[in-house]
C-alpha cells in the first residue's frame, strides 16, 4: 500500500486509520492516532461539513494531522469507493446512533469481505444492541453521563451537575483508541479482524465505579460533594487559602500526624477515633471529621497559597494551586515541558493549543499540518486507491464526492 504524503514519525507510523463521525467522541480517537503518527482519514458528509467546523478555534486542535475525505459512503459508487478504501485500512472507527451502519447495509461482514483483518470500532451512546427504547437514540456527553450514573455523583449536595468539558466524549474516544489497538494486536497475530461495540454510557459507568461499588455491594450511595470537598474523606478536595484556591489530598500516616500538629489537633492522634496508623480521615464515619475540616479551613484561610504549598511540600502532602487558564502559559512546569505549543493553520494563521501527549522518548508524536478544509484531500485519497481523474470527476458530478475548490 502506498501512503498519502506525510512525514514518517511516531509509534504508529505506517498505520492507516479511517473514521466517520462528527463533533468530539469518535474524532478524538482518530486525533490520538494521528498525533502518534498514523495516517488518519476523516470522512465527512458531502453536503454538510462536520458541525465541529462552526467552532472558531477548537477544530484546529481536534482535526490537526488529518486527511479530509468528503464522500457519500452509503450510496452507489460512493459506497464502492469506501469499500475499496477499507481494503487498505487497518482500523475503521464510526460514531453514530446504534447500528446505523448495519441498517444502511455496511455490516461488519461486508467490511470483512473486503478486508478480513480489519479492526472495526463502533462508538454510540447506547451500544449496537439492547432494547429498541434506547439503542437507536442520539447521545452526546451529558446523555451518557446522565444514563450511566456518573452525572448524579457530581455537582454539589444541592444539585447534580455534569462534568465538563465533555468528559464522556473524551473518555469514550480514548476507549475507542485503546480498544482498537488491542484488537489490532490480535488481528495481526491471527489474521482475523475484530468488531468493537463501545457504548458511551458503559464507558462512563466504568469511570464512575469508585463510589458505585458501595451501592452494588452494600446498598450505600456516597453523597455528592460539598463546596468541592471529597464526599468521603476529610482533608481531600477543594479548599480556600488567603489568596485563592488549592486542592489537596491528606493521605498517609505521617502526613496526617504532621498536619494535625500544624492545625492544633495533635491531641486526637492515637485516640480510638483516630488510632495510630490512620491513613485517611473519614468525613462521615469519624466523629472528628467535621472538626478536622473546621480546623483545616481556618489554618488554610490564614495562609497564602505559596505558604501552604511550601509547608505541604515539606510534609509530603499532595496539593496544587487551582490555576486559571491565563496562568498556564507562564507556569514553569508548562514551559519546561512545552505543554502548550503553536503551529500554522492551513490558511497561514498561528494557532496555540495543548501539545501532543503523552511524550514518547524514542518515537515522539508530531504536529505536521493544521485542520484540512472540507474535501481538501478527497482527490489524493481516491487516487491513492486507484481512481483516475475521470473517475473522481464522475463521483463529484453525481454529488457523491466533494473536492477542494
Curated annotation (Swiss-Prot):
Top-level lineage group: Bacteria
GN (gene name): caiB
Cross-referenced Pfam families: CoA_transf_3
Stated family: Belongs to the CoA-transferase III family. CaiB subfamily.
InterPro entries: CoA-transferase_III (IPR050509), CoA-Trfase_CaiB (IPR023452), CoA-Trfase_fam_III (IPR003673), CoA-Trfase_III_dom3_sf (IPR044855), CoA-Trfase_III_dom_1_sf (IPR023606)
One BP annotation, GO: carnitine metabolic process
Major location (coarse): cytoplasm
The enzyme's E.C. designation: 2.8.3.21
Top-tier EC class: transferase
Protein name: L-carnitine CoA-transferase
Function: Catalyzes the reversible transfer of the CoA moiety from gamma-butyrobetainyl-CoA to L-carnitine to generate L-carnitinyl-CoA and gamma-butyrobetaine. Is also able to catalyze the reversible transfer of the CoA moiety from gamma-butyrobetainyl-CoA or L-carnitinyl-CoA to crotonobetaine to generate crotonobetainyl-CoA.
Disulfide bonds: none
Cellular component annotations (GO), alphabetically ordered: cytoplasm
Amino acid at each position: 500500500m502506498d501512503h498519502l504524503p506525510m512525514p514518517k514519525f511516531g509509534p504508529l507510523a505506517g498505520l492507516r486509520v479511517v473514521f466517520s463521525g462528527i463533533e468530539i467522541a469518535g474524532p478524538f480517537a482518530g486525533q490520538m492516532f494521528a498525533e502518534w503518527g498514523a495516517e488518519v482519514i476523516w470522512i465527512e458528509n458531502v453536503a454538510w461539513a462536520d458541525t465541529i467546523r462552526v467552532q472558531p478555534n477548537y477544530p484546529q486542535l481536534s482535526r490537526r494531522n488529518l486527511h479530509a475525505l468528503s464522500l457519500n459512503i452509503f450510496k452507489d459508487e460512493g459506497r464502492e469507493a469506501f469499500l475499496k478504501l477499507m481494503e487498505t485500512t487497518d482500523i475503521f472507527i464510526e460514531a453514530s446512533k446504534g447500528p446505523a451502519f448495519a441498517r444502511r447495509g455496511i455490516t461488519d461482514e461486508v467490511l470483512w469481505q473486503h478486508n478480513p483483518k480489519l479492526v472495526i470500532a463502533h462508538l454510540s451512546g447506547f451500544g449496537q444492541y439492547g432494547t429498541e427504547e434506547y439503542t437507536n437514540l442520539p447521545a452526546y456527553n451529558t446523555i451518557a453521563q446522565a444514563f450511566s450514573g456518573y452525572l448524579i455523583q457530581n455537582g454539589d449536595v444541592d444539585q447534580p451537575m455534569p462534568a465538563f468539558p465533555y468528559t464522556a466524549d473524551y473518555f469514550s474516544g480514548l476507549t475507542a483508541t485503546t480498544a482498537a489497538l488491542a484488537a489490532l494486536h490480535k488481528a495481526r497475530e491471527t489474521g482475523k479482524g475484530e468488531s468493537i461495540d463501545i457504548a458511551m454510557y458503559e464507558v462512563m459507568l466504568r469511570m464512575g465505579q469508585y463510589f458505585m461499588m458501595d451501592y452494588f455491594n452494600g446498598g450505600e450511595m456516597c453523597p455528592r460533594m460539598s463546596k468541592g470537598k471529597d464526599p468521603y474523606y476529610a482533608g481531600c478536595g477543594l479548599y480556600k487559602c488567603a489568596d485563592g484556591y488549592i486542592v489537596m489530598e491528606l493521605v498517609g500516616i505521617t502526613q496526617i500526624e504532621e498536619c494535625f500538629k500544624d492545625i492544633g489537633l495533635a491531641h486526637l492522634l492515637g485516640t480510638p477515633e483516630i488510632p495510630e496508623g490512620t491513613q485517611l480521615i473519614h468525613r462521615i464515619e469519624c466523629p472528628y471529621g467535621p472538626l478536622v475540616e473546621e480546623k483545616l479551613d481556618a489554618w488554610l484561610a490564614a495562609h497564602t497559597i505559596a505558604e501552604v504549598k511550601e509547608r505541604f511540600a515539606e510534609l509530603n502532602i499532595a496539593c496544587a494551586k487551582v490555576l486559571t487558564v491565563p496562568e498556564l502559559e507562564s507556569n514553569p512546569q508548562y514551559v519546561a515541558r512545552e505543554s502548550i505549543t503553536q503551529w500554522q493553520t492551513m490558511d497561514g494563521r498561528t494557532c496555540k493549543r495543548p501539545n501532543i501527549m503523552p511524550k514518547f522518548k524514542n518515537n515522539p508524536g508530531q504536529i505536521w499540518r493544521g485542520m484540512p478544509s472540507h474535501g481538501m484531500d478527497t482527490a489524493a485519497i481516491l487516487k491513492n486507491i486507484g481512481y483516475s481523474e475521470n473517475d473522481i470527476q464522475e463521483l463529484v458530478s453525481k454529488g457523491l464526492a466533494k473536492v477542494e475548490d
